[in-house]
Amino acid sequence: MHKINVAQKLGTFEDHWSPKIVGELNGQHVKLVKFQGEFVWHRHAAEDELFLVLHGVFRMDYRDDAGAERAMELSQGEFVIVPRGTEHRPVATEEVHVMLFEPAGTLNTGNVEGAMTVPNPQSI
């Protein structure tokens, strides 16, 4: 058992949209990621995801059950759980620091593979 200094871990990388694993519990990865710009629309068929804002503000775009596009803004200290199967994309005009909780092995781009896909996130 050991403690993790989140600020120190965030200081070890600068890249955006590249989640880093900082812990694991009960088959879940705890990840840190920096957002800036627009991510790809995607969904996770089998995994829920929790996004906790540590610093900054971002918008979570998502499509509801009827396929209508919706959005919510999240600020420091707020979190959202994106249910499995929900199409979504984070958008950040300024750099945002986020902690993610998701099942180990969850692909960051879900059902979409491309330039933003990180198949094997680094542990830091």
Q: Which ranges hold each PLM region?
A:
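Short, conserved beta-strand element in jelly-roll/cupin
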Residues: 34-35, 44-64, 101
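Ligand-binding loop in jelly-roll beta-barrel domains
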Residues: 84-114
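Conserved short histidine dyad/triad with adjacent acidic residue
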Residues: 15, 29-45
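Short acidic-glycine-tyrosine-enriched beta hairpin
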Residues: 64-84
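A short, N-terminal "cap"/entry segment at the start of jelly-roll beta-barrel domains
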Residues: 1-31, 113-124
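A cytosolic small-molecule/anion-sensing beta-strand core signal
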Residues: 26, 54-55, 75-76, 94
